[in-house]
């Protein structure tokens, strides 16, 4: 999703590939996969981001996701 990142493509690819492997292992259909990923994002926001920044970060993430699917 992000065009510029402080993380390497290799780091991101390794994590994404692991996450895809888990979803495939469980034969998760698209809707279940999206629910699981949404729950993961919500959990990360509520456990790792100060409450004062959560909504703005969630909005930025949402905008980035929307832009990513528009360009594909």
From Swiss-Prot:
Top-rank taxon, per record: Bacteria
SUPFAM superfamilies membership: YejL-like
NCBIfam families hit by this protein: PRK13689.1
UniProt family annotation: Belongs to the UPF0352 family.
Protein name: UPF0352 protein CGSHiEE_07850
Native source species: Haemophilus influenzae (strain PittEE)
């Amino acid at each position: 999703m992000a065009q510029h990142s402080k993380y390497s493509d290799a780091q991101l690819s390794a994590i994404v590939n692991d996450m895809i492997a888990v979803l495939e292992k469980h034969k998760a259909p698209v809707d279940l996969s999206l629910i699981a990923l949404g729950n993961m994002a919500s959990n990360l926001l509520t456990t790792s981001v100060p409450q004062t920044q959560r909504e703005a970060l969630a909005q930025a993430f949402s905008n980035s996701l929307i832009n990513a699917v528009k360009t594909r």
